Swiss-Prot record:
GO terms for molecular function: mRNA 3'-UTR AU-rich region binding. GO terms for biological process: rRNA catabolic process. HAMAP family: Exosome_Rrp42. Component of the archaeal exosome complex. Forms a hexameric ring-like arrangement composed of 3 Rrp41-Rrp42 heterodimers. The hexameric ring associates with a trimer of Rrp4 and/or Csl4 subunits. GO terms for cellular component: cytoplasmic exosome (RNase complex). The gene is rrp42. Belongs to the RNase PH family. Rrp42 subfamily. This is Exosome complex component Rrp42. Non-catalytic component of the exosome, which is a complex involved in RNA degradation. Contributes to the structuring of the Rrp41 active site.
Amino acid sequence: MSDNEIVAGIMRDHIINLLKEGKRIDDRGFEDYRPIEIEVGVIEKAEGSALVKLGSTQVLVGIKTSLGEPFPDTPNMGVMTTNVELVPLASPTFEPGPPDERAIELARVIDRGIRESKALNLEKMVIVPGKIVRVVFIDVHVLDHDGNLMDAIGIAAIAALLNARVPKVRYNEETGEVETLDETEPLPVEKIPVPVTFAKIGNILVVDPSLDEELVMDGKITITTDETGHISAVQKSEGGAFKLEEVMYAVETAFKKAEEIRKLILEAVEKAKQ
């Protein structure tokens, strides 16, 4: 057994013993998030942006848009694409190069949560049906990784979308060209999906796992909900099994915690307008 494995075993035993006493390694309750800070409009050249600090985890999201063609199977819908970059300085486990499995999973789950909740109304992003639509790029940069990237990215992504203002455009039927106007308008964001992540350590579920907790967890589940009472994404990862009653508890708690976070997002967006 290597020294790293011995240290990991000691840490796991310590964390589990604390959990059995109703405590966490950082003194939070089982359903408590670390402090959440949200600041929007932080990238001057982006059409929307948000910086989120979740404890020591930090992520930056920028929104850019362009005009392009719709996908052939959705001619009357705009396009949204999500990309996650794990900046090497954020963690010794992040390496330069193309997106790895972690980045792909993060992007896929966040994209699904927004898309399936219809938070961004893609039908309202059509300029010329079947020909020209608005294309929205959600670019995520992880600046510091101290656990629970999923929730930090999800919060930052929807906050940045709410913050975005894009140039108004007008289609000239006579010339067949799209004219870009001087005015701007918000993106058609109609819901606020929020992911809530649980780590299972032993037989106990904790919200918003820190990096230390993630290193010893048996499994992880993320549940994304919106304010209309719908679940738009569920992602289980890192192995492990969840009993039905554990999943039901996670769903109930996810709705409750998401509502709290949603208020913080709206407060940050409104503050930036003042």
